[in-house]
């Protein structure tokens, strides 16, 4: 960490509850304002966010100084497995979004475009499907009473990149351009 790492990702598989004590052990000796913290989690994303918030508050860190995110993405789970691990996935997305509202630089919704690429879609299809998934999150959450200005900044996209270097760069640039026009 002291030699240039600026982002950490923790893969927390399984469906067990994650406690504040677990989070304290995980984040021991990590300067949370200096390093972006990301979580890839199973079903219990809410307990991970609760534990993370508790550690941040205990350390007295201002929420706006925290950077990172968590992979709350029921559409990707549905695409990959045909089901979600909870009955009302978009309600959970909304709850997690509201829970982390003060954390301006912490993304709580991830659009997993890589799933489309890994399933055989072309670069253009991956881009189109990913943007459509992002719009679906905007639609569901604005229908649930949230404002687009609350939702859009909390969404991040996770794209795959392949060996077609210049096409992949064009895809990423097009994604930024098109998403800016959507929101």
Give, region by region, the residue ranges found by the protein language model.
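Glycine-rich anion/phosphate-binding loop at the beta-strand->alpha-helix junction
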Residues: 131, 157-183
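Catalytic alpha/beta active-site cores
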Residues: 1-164
């Amino acid at each position: 960490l002291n030699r240039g790492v600026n982002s950490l990702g923790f893969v927390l598989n399984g469906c067990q509850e994650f406690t504040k004590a677990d989070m304290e052990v995980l984040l021991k000796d990590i300067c949370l304002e200096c390093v972006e913290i990301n979580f890839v989690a199973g079903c219990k994303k809410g307990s991970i966010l609760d534990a993370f918030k508790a550690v941040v508050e205990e350390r007295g860190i201002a929420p706006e100084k925290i950077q990172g995110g968590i992979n709350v993405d029921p559409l990707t789970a549905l695409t990959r497995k045909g089901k979600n691990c909870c009955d009302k996935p978009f309600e959970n997305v909304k709850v997690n979004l509201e829970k982390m509202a003060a954390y301006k630089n912490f993304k709580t919704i991830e659009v997993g475009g890589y799933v489309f690429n890994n399933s055989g879609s072309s670069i253009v299809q991956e881009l189109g499907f990913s943007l459509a998934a992002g719009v679906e999150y905007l639609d569901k959450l604005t229908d649930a009473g949230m404002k687009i200005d609350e939702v859009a900044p909390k969404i991040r996209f996770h794209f795959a990149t392949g060996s077609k270097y210049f096409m992949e760069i064009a895809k990423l640039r097009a994604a930024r351009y098109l998403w800016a026009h959507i929101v």
